[in-house]
Amino acid sequence: MQLLEKYGAVVIRDRAKILLPTPRINSRAVKIMAQYQIKNVWFGAAAPLALMAGKLRKEGASNIVALSHGHEIWWARVPLLKIAFQKIVKSIDYLGYLGEFTKNEILNSSIKIKNQTEKFIQIAPGIDTNHFTPKPNNNGLVAKYQLEGRRVIVCVGRLVHRKGQDQLIKALPKILEQFPDAILLLVGEGPTKQMLFNTAKQAGVLAKVIFAGKVSHSALPDYICLGEVFAMPVRSRFAGLEVEGLGIVYLEASACGLPVVVGNSGGAVDAVLDQITGVLIDSSNVDQIAAAISNLLAKPDAAKQMGQAGRGWVIDNWQLDSWSKKFNKILIGD
């Protein structure tokens, strides 16, 4: 009801735990289109739901937009899935991509897709730079986590293998050699939490790692701003089939004025200007991770300049309002 009153949006739930383009979902989508006289369709994830695009087109959809993330890369690479993804691209009007890496990987996957370059258009989530903005340390959080006088390295993300939090923990002993007051603040929840706990224990740094858990969107800037450095050494998995789509949290950290240490996986390279807003590292190299973070801690003025440059870059290129207007123009012509 709140979404309807505020945005004019009707939310329709389905009993399926995972929404897939099954005959039942196709049929239900067609009925919803007819009920609300829908002509413009947006698929939040191109694969696999946009396989419904052809059916919806026949039923009256005049403009269909689908957004690609990191996982569409393996849809475009794996032989059988590639055929399905080619069908998706053929059936839609626009395929949104987060950054240049994702665009190029998908375009170069096949001639059939490359011949439809005109359908590709960048659509990024955008950053609310009023929400994600530099701010003084939250005294309550400083007291809660006993951070007074500590050199805080912050990482925000789901606790999953791709995000590379284990590599940060493995790099921590080398960082502590130079900065014994350093501490790693991990924000997020996920299936690798116990593994990360064990890794920290084995490395002898458990007392130097804080597992803050999941925090609300409203509180996230306060957590990010506790850090001097934001680091998340994301990595590619399964022979490059699982990659980081963009890493929006790097941009959120930049908007908060922090230098970012970014892993070289997939579209994460589009979320940093190497040596300007942060440092791009080989996420498989623990020594390189440790060196990048230590260098930023050792040169706080240079780190601050990177953070300031990052905020300026986000304001100029990743503002929520500008991306919202671009998306609305593509979808409904506003």
Describe each PLM feature range.
Residues 181, 288, 295, 302-316, ...:
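A short, well-ordered alpha-helix in the C-terminal region of glycosyltransferases
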Residues 147-163, 169-172:
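Conserved donor-binding/catalytic core segment of Leloir-type glycosyltransferases
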Residues 82, 90-136, 211-212:
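Donor nucleotide-sugar binding/catalytic pocket of nucleotide-sugar-dependent glycosyltransferases
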Residues 230-231, 250, 255, 259-262, ...:
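Short hydrophobic beta-strand element within catalytic cores of glycosyltransferases
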Residues 225-243, 258:
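Acidic donor-binding loop of glycosyltransferase active sites
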Residues 115, 196-221, 229:
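Nucleotide-activated donor-binding/catalytic signature segment of Leloir-type glycosyltransferases, i.e.
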Residues 43-49:
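Short His-centered aromatic/hydrophobic patch
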Residues 273-275, 279-286, 295-301:
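Conserved acidic donor-binding segment of nucleotide-sugar-dependent glycosyltransferases
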